A protein has these predicted regions:
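Juxtamembrane loop-to-helix connectors within ABC transporter transmembrane domains
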Residues: 9, 17, 49, 84, ...
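Transmembrane helices of ABC transporter permease
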Residues: 19, 23-36, 73, 77, ...
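Helix-loop-helix
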Residues: 59-65, 158-175, 242, 246-315, ...
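An intracellular "coupling" helix at the cytosolic face of ABC transporter transmembrane type-1 domains
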Residues: 22, 112-113, 129-138, 142, ...
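Transmembrane helix-loop-helix hairpins at lipid-water interfaces of multipass membrane proteins
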Residues: 24-83, 87, 161-165, 276-280
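Short intracellular "coupling" helices and adjacent cytoplasmic loop segments at the cytosolic face
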Residues: 1-4, 93, 101-125, 129-131, ...
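ABC-type nucleotide-binding domain
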Residues: 322, 329, 336-582
Length: 582
């Protein structure tokens, strides 16, 4: 990470800390109390040593008093450290919670193009793993950095009070450890950043494989998947080992420096005792302070190394937060009301990639209650057209109108609530069957829910489930067949009954008998509602009012089933290829 970017990351972290200024101040005060009490103990210890070795009889009364003071200081230090750790946990976990909430909210505001371009595993890794890594480093910083810096300042003050010249030796030699730590941390940060990126790749790959494990097994792709996994795993191991290597040599290198400092202080101190400049007790206190002075440097170098990992993780989260959200609703956007189903596309152009046009000069006018079937080869723009109708993407040129309103001038919520969708890929949330059917209408009554299930021909199999409508569905509906999942998705739409419908390959995964029952249910559902139907099996769209035959983003043919067969064109060829006798 470049220096400027690292500074910006640090500045943004500070912004997240601002709401918890009081807690941070409390942590700082507790750190000062803890350090002050800790540093007072060597003074008492030195006095105790002088009390024992002084000429004449040992002053036991004073010695006992000193021991009591030491015990009290140790007890108060432990209490202050416990409170400080509790406060630090509050700060870091709250910052992590705030960051995770913001990241998840921002993810929902991102355009579909961003989500399509990134694996779900990478996004999960940024929101979960990277934020955990960041808060772990932040917690370590609060816990050890505060006390470390205060301890260094405090010990210098106490040592100056005992002997300024020996203190000068300590202060002069100490910066060498910082040079060593800085040299190593620059190299470790790059490795931690690559480790974080590779961890995200691994999460995405494992998530993809587990989500499609049946397909992997069917195509005997296990060995190839294992090779891909091994490659990612090798990369992760390489970057992890390199990061660990650089971080692991920081502490030994600095410890070596501090051992030299300690030895130098011991020699200089002994000479001072011989000259009578300081007492043996003061030397004992000074050596204790030297040890306490060097110890925070060891901890701080460890914190710096860990903080490199934390910064790398935070940078990945901020990359997500910096992505431009989808174009917000216009300030004067109005909610669609009294939607009857008038839809019009005027000279629409669209492409996912600027250089590769997909839909060009597309025109279509749909009257309320019409059933518009869209057919054509893969990649002709059928699903893209649905994405544009729902405003998952905005058109490049032209406009789409609903009830005479440009959909860019109405709220997305009112537009999308006007459509009911049965997608090619079914989606069910982890929860009960009841919760899934009522997903679009949480306030539905029991009678309404059961009626919707019956109309979708789902009531029968639901009743046979162990707990009926209260049966728990696993993530993605793993304990249901593909047909059952699709029936529940259809029941969900049956319950809300919006004024317009989008059926994208709605029955492509259902057996023939179930398809016939669903087609009958669809007839009831689509009556009086504008419906857009996409299907490869032409048997599902023969009753459509208008069939659009698309190719390369253009309408090749348009008409009813009978009219298009009579033309003996593209639709007729497609129909004959599916229904011609073998």
């Amino acid at each position: 990470m470049k220096k400027d970017k690292k500074q910006k990351t640090l500045q943004r972290i500070m912004e997240y800390m601002k709401p918890y200024r009081f807690l941070i101040f409390a942590s700082l005060v507790l750190a000062v109390i803890s350090v002050a009490l800790t540093l007072y103990v060597p003074i008492l210890t030195g006095q105790g040593v002088d009390c024992i070795i002084s000429k004449g009889n040992v002053d036991f009364a004073r010695l006992i008093s000193i021991i009591k003071m030491i015990v009290i200081c140790i007890a108060l230090t432990a209490a202050a450290q416990w409170l400080m750790n509790h406060v630090n946990n509050q700060i870091t976990y709250k910052i992590g919670k705030d960051l995770r909430i913001q990241a998840f909210e921002h993810l929902q505001k991102l355009p579909l193009s961003y989500v399509d371009a990134h694996s779900s595993g990478d996004l999960i890794s940024r929101i979960v793993t990277d934020i955990d890594q960041f808060t772990d480093g932040l917690l370590l910083g609060f816990t050890q950095l505060f006390t470390g810096v205060i301890t260094i300042i405090g010990t210098i003050c106490f040592m100056l009070g005992i002997n300024p010249w020996i203190t000068l030796v300590v202060v002069i030699l100490s910066p060498f450890s910082f040079f060593i730590a800085s040299f190593i941390s620059k190299r470790s940060f790059n490795m931690f950043r690559k480790q974080s990126q590779t961890r995200g790749n691994m999460t995405g790959f494992v998530n993809e494989m587990l989500g499609n494990i049946k397909v992997v097994k069917v195509f005997d792709h296990g060995e190839k998947a294992q090779e891909e996994f091994d490659q990612i795993n090798d990369d992760l191991a390489y970057y992890s080992l390199r990061a660990t290597f650089f971080s692991s040599i920081t502490n030994p290198a600095t410890r070596f420096m501090y051992s030299g400092i300690y030895a130098g202080v011991a020699i200089a101190g002994c000479m001072s005792v011989i000259r009578g400049s300081i007492s043996v007790g003061q030397l004992s206190s000074f050596l204790s302070y030297t040890n306490q002075y060097t110890k925070p440097f060891n901890e701080i170098t460890g914190v710096i190394t860990e903080f490199q990992n934390s910064l790398a993780s935070a940078a990945r989260v901020f990359e997500l937060l910096d992505e431009e959200p989808m174009i917000p609703d216009a300030k004067d956007a109005k909610a669609l009301q009294d939607v009857k189903g008038n839809v019009e596309l005027e000279h629409v152009d669209f492409s996912y990639v600027k250089e590769v046009p997909l839909i060009q000069d597309f025109n279509l006018k749909v009257e309320p209650g019409q059933r518009i079937a869209i057919v054509g080869p893969t990649g002709c723009g059928k699903t893209t057209l649905i994405n544009l109708l729902m405003r998952f993407y905005d058109v490049n040129v032209g406009m789409i109108k609903v009830e005479g309103n440009d959909i860019r001038d109405v709220t997305r919520e009112s537009l999308r609530s006007s459509y009911g969708m049965v997608l090619q890929e079914t989606w069910l949330k982890a929860g009960t069957i009841r919760e899934n059917i009522c997903y679009g209408k949480p306030d539905a009554t029991e009678e309404e829910m059961i009626m919707a299930a019956k109309e979708a021909n789902a009531h029968g199999f639901i009743e046979r489930m162990p707990d009926g409508y209260d049966t728990i569905i696993t993530e993605g509906g793993g304990n249901l067949s593909q047909g059952q999942k699709q029936l529940l998705c259809i029941a969900r739409i049956m319950l809300s009954l919006p004024p317009m419908l989008i059926l994208d390959e709605a029955t492509s995964s259902i057996d023939t008998m179930t398809e016939l029952r669903i087609q009958k249910a669809f007839e009831t559902m689509m009556k009086g509602r504008t419906s857009f139907i996409i299907a490869h099996r032409l048997s599902t769209i023969q009753n459509a009012d208008v069939i659009l035959v698309m190719e390369n983003g253009h309408i090749l043919e348009q008409g009813t089933h009978e009219e298009l067969l009579a033309k003996n064109g593209a639709y007729a060829r497609l129909y004959n290829s599916q229904f011609a006798p073998v």
